């Protein structure tokens, strides 16, 4: 499509707003501020070592080394978090923010007006890959603040953010790869925008994104196989058995270790992603964070006709219990996710209680 015929992100949001004549435009303004933050991060990522942005945050003058998750921070983690805060705190759209990189909610400074939305984000997902030039991204979720927060203007608390994924009013991610893309839902399907570096604008390039219901691809970190629960072992075992196994078809396995990149591949061509609950660490019933990773990706998948789940229940129905709560996550092509859910609810047979890489392993020589 010629450039002149493509909508900008701003035009797209205006068209969406027209569906609701009483809308104030405050949500549109917030999404545009988020997109501006993503543009700034995309530029920093693109410069890499030339911009002195690679390496651990411990080398920065401001210090920083380990975040609230106990993870070593990269320079770009710290920079990206700061960009999100500075680009979004001033506009009057937000009552507060929460981030993977901050232990407690961020209060909007007193010199700025406060609004009716909450912004939750992972400023740089997959940052462990940044030093080896693998695609990374930013994930965000927008919630409506509780009415008493809006009415009183009080400081937000952790409890204000503990809303199920179904309460999200918008969600999306930016992918910093060969091109920078923004995938967005405002509750009316999923649209994809590509950053035009000449104009500095996100242009609509993927309208009405749909995840195929069936697939021949799955993504999982097979190094954790010994910790998987039996339903996950069963599913992977059957996929690996290929055309001669119970599924009657061959599957490909993918693993990038960057959830934004995995989610983008699935939105573009289908597939299923699994980072399930396992027995590796009993204190962590999952690896990914519910509020700013699982929920926004889950909303995108559901809006694109896919499915997101814990493996046992729909992801968007989970009631959060803490700001940085971890959870098992399965998302992608609807029929595959539903199969995995079904396996979790069926009785465990002795056959699939056997570790995948033990004597029955399909990897056995």
UniProtKB/Swiss-Prot annotation:
Keywords: Carbohydrate metabolism, Cytoplasm, Hydrolase, Magnesium, Metal-binding. GO terms for molecular function: fructose 1,6-bisphosphate 1-phosphatase activity; magnesium ion binding. Its cofactor is Mg(2+). PROSITE patterns: FBPASE. Belongs to the FBPase class 1 family. It is found in: Cytoplasm. The keyword Cytoplasm applies. GO terms for cellular component: cytosol. It catalyses: beta-D-fructose 1,6-bisphosphate + H2O = beta-D-fructose 6-phosphate + phosphate. Binds 2 magnesium ions per subunit. Its main location: cytoplasm. It holds the Pfam family FBPase. This is Fructose-1,6-bisphosphatase class 1 2. Its EC number is 3.1.3.11.
């Amino acid at each position: 499509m010629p450039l002149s015929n493509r909508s900008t992100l701003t035009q797209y949001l205006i068209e969406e707003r027209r569906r609701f004549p009483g809308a104030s435009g405050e949500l549109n303004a917030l999404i545009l501020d988020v997109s501006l933050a993503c543009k700034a991060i995309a530029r920093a990522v693109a410069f890499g070592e030339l911009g002195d942005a690679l390496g651990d945050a411990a080398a920065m003058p401001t210090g920083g080394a380990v975040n609230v998750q106990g993870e070593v921070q990269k320079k770009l983690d710290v920079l990206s978090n700061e960009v999100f805060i500075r680009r979004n705190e001033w506009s009057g759209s937000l009552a507060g923010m929460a981030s993977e990189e901050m232990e407690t909610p961020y209060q909007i400074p007193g010199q700025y007006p406060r609004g009716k939305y909450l912004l939750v984000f992972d400023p740089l997902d997959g940052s462990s890959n940044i030093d080896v030039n693998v695609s990374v991204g930013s994930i965000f979720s927008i919630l409506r603040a509780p009415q008493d927060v809006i009415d009183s203007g009080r400081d937000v608390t952790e409890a204000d953010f503990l809303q199920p994924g179904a309460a999200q009013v918008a969600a999306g991610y930016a992918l910093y790869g060969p091109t920078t893309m923004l995938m967005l839902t405002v509750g009316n399907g999923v649209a994809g925008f590509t950053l035009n570096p000449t104009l500095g604008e996100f242009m609509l390039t993927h309208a009405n994104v749909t995840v195929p219901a069936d697939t021949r691809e799955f993504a999982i970190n097979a190094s954790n196989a010994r910790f998987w629960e039996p339903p996950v072992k069963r599913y992977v075992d059957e996929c690996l058995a290929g055309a001669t196994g119970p599924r009657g078809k061959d599957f490909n396995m993918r693993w990038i270790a960057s959830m934004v990149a995995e989610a983008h591949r699935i939105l573009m061509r289908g597939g299923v992603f699994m980072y399930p609950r396992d027995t590796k660490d009993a204190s962590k019933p999952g690896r990914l964070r519910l509020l700013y990773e699982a929920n926004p990706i889950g909303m995108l998948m559901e809006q694109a006709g896919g499915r997101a789940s814990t493996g046992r229940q729909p992801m968007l129905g989970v009631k959060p219990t803490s700001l940085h709560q971890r959870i098992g996550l399965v998302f992608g092509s609807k029929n595959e996710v539903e199969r995995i859910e079904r396996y979790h609810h069926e009785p465990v047979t002795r056959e699939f209680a056997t570790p995948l890489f033990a004597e029955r392993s399909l990897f056995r020589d």
